[in-house]
Design a protein with these regions (language model features):
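Soluble accessory domains appended to multi-pass membrane transport proteins
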Residues: 11-105
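Membrane-spanning helices that line or support transport/gating and their immediate boundary helices
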Residues: 2-13
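Hydrophobic face of alpha-helices
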Residues: 4, 87-91, 141, 145
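Solvent-exposed, non-transmembrane regulatory segments of membrane-associated proteins
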Residues: 81, 101-167
Length: 167
């Protein structure tokens, strides 16, 4: 196992798959790489838990620092709401997010409005997507959710109400 740890570790490090400070998911664990040695990687979760993971036990991993971030935002709207009114409220919210300089600087390109991506007995779902700088998808999403809530409220666009049928 020691030889396998070393060989796997060399390949991952040679391929520059992760570096100290990167946010990664390895198996069920997501955290920040704090240490890399010839035999293992140390990952700290946001709960504070520190995990030492032997290189040989890593079959796949995701690195959130490489390349780009992505926001896929779905918003459920009461099925009886006017689709055009809901779409306009979403577009107004996105325009306000894009007008915020500190947020706009985190976004690559323009947002993409997909439109209706889901339909149920109680709701339809609208989607907008953004490409962001690495690790900035959450900042963009928080700003977007705040503006969507605000603009949906201003336009009177309601979320679906859960109903229960008692038999």
């Amino acid at each position: 196992t020691l030889v396998k740890d070393i060989i796997t570790g060399i390949f991952i490090q040679f391929e520059n798959g992760m570096n100290t400070g990167d946010l990664v998911t390895i198996g069920p664990l997501t955290g920040t790489v704090e240490r890399m040695s010839i035999r293992s990687v140390g990952v700290r979760q946001d709960t504070g838990a520190y995990h030492i993971i032997p290189w040989s036990s890593i079959t796949t991993f995701a690195n959130f620092v490489r390349g780009i971030g992505s926001v896929v935002a779905n918003y459920d709207v009461d099925r009886h709401e006017d689709l055009d009114k809901a779409n306009q409220a979403l577009k107004d919210a996105v325009a306000e997010v894009m007008a915020q300089e500190e947020i706009r600087g985190l976004i690559i390109g323009e947002p993409s409005f997909t439109g209706v991506v889901g339909l149920s007995n109680t709701a339809f779902t609208l989607r907008v997507t953004f490409t962001t700088l690495p690790l900035k998808q959450w900042t963009v999403r928080f700003a977007l959710d705040t503006q969507v809530k605000r603009h949906f409220d201003l336009a009177g666009v309601r979320a679906p109400v859960q109903t229960y049928q008692v038999l």
